[in-house]
């Protein structure tokens, strides 16, 4: 039997997302001249489809369906991402010249969201054949053994970071890959060398795009005072950026969080959603949550989210199948890193990456892809010893 608690927790988060979409999209509906329930109705539709998808997948036989679904997501979405730059304008939506969404029946679908789930399954399936067999292996042999995955990852990251101009997804997938490598049995020394290599690639991606440099400067302008206090004055002045670099989004996000206080301003009573924070019902949903529902509301959502992750990790820990073990771990890591990257970004701890919050942010692609991941984990949970 599939894990009912996990199903209930995910359904709860989806229900919360519908409420947040309604209350936080007030200004956006006016801006676009649509009905006040426009985004809430769409998110409700996405929510019901997602819950139904989870339920259907949970009924499946993991021995027969898990691999076909995983590889279909991996290969199918990869092909779509590669083909998107060559598709006509009426089939794709572009932002800043980057084509990220495919238009289907009045909705936009982002293949990268489904690629992440398929990529995690591909890694789990591949790593499971090498699980725990690195003992006594030198670091050179480890690099040779895992080189094919590095090639696949670099190819995927090139498409996502350069073609689709989406570095945030690279960060989430890169972190997931690194930690899955460690759980798959690679040595700690190998893990550290890959981590350093990933950091070098990350810096390369940042400094090859002007808009990313501006975003880093915007974040650093806000964070620099508290950090530079730790350095000697001569070094601190060299690292300081001009104060005219305005961290607009981060500043308003922090103001929204501060304005919410302990108990919040109350549902629909938020101020910063009224044009001060763009996309507050998507990328800044946690800031909107903090303003209207306060610290208590955020704490409740974090509790539900952490409980969901705990159930996913429990399924992984109770499984004797190494593929299911690694896939469940990978899904838990993927969702956790997405949540953390968003939370750190809107609170000014790290630069904003444009990553949505799983099951909470408005958007069909994100919630549906995450639902595929949860549905596959629930399907796999029938092979785990949960009792």
Each model region followed by its residue ranges:
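Hydrophobic alpha-helical segments of polytopic membrane proteins
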Residues: 70-76, 147-160, 167-207, 219
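Loop-to-helix entry and N-terminal half of a specific, functionally important transmembrane alpha helix
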Residues: 312-354, 360
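Alpha-helical transmembrane segments of multi-pass membrane proteins
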Residues: 13, 47-51, 80-84, 114-125, 157, 173-177, 302-306, ...
């Amino acid at each position: 039997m599939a894990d009912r608690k996990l199903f209930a927790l995910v359904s709860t988060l989806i229900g919360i997302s519908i409420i947040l979409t309604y209350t936080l999209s007030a200004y956006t509906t006016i801006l676009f001249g649509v009905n006040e329930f426009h985004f809430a109705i769409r998110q409700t539709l996405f929510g019901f489809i997602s819950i139904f998808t989870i339920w259907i997948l949970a009924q499946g036989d993991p021995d027969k369906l898990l691999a076909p679904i995983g590889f279909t997501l991996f290969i199918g979405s990869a092909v779509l991402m590669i083909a998107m730059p060559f598709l006509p304008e009426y089939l794709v939506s572009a932002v800043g010249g980057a084509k990220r969404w495919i238009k289907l029946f009045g909705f936009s679908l982002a293949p990268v969201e489904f690629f992440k789930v398929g990529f995690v399954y591909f890694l789990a399936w591949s790593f499971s054949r090498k699980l725990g067999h690195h003992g006594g292996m030198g670091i050179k042999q480890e690099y040779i053994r895992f080189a094919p995955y590095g090639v696949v990852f670099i190819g995927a990251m090139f498409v996502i970071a350069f073609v689709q101009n989406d570095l945030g997804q690279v960060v989430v997938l890169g972190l997931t890959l690194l930690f899955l490598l460690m759980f798959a049995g690679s040595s700690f020394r190998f893990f550290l060398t890959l981590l350093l290599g990933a950091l070098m690639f990350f810096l390369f991606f940042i400094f090859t795009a002007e808009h990313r440099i501006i975003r880093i400067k915007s974040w650093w302008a806000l964070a620099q005072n508290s950090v530079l206090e730790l350095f000697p004055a001569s070094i601190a002045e060299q690292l300081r950026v001009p104060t005219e670099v305005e961290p607009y989004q981060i500043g308003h996000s922090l103001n929204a969080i501060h304005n919410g206080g302990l108990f919040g301003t109350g549902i629909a009573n938020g101020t910063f959603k009224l044009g001060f924070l763009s996309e507050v019902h998507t990328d800044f949903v946690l800031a909107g949550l903090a303003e209207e529902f306060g610290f208590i509301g955020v704490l409740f959502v974090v509790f539900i989210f952490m409980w969901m992750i705990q159930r996913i990790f429990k399924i992984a820990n109770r499984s004797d199948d190494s593929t299911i073990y690694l896939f469940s771990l990978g899904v838990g890591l993927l969702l956790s890193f997405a949540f953390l990257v968003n939370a750190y970004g809107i609170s000014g701890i790290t630069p904003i990456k444009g990553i949505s919050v799983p099951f909470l942010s408005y958007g069909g692609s994100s919630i549906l892809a995450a639902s595929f991941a949860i549905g596959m984990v629930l399907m796999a949970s029938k092979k785990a010893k949960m009792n």
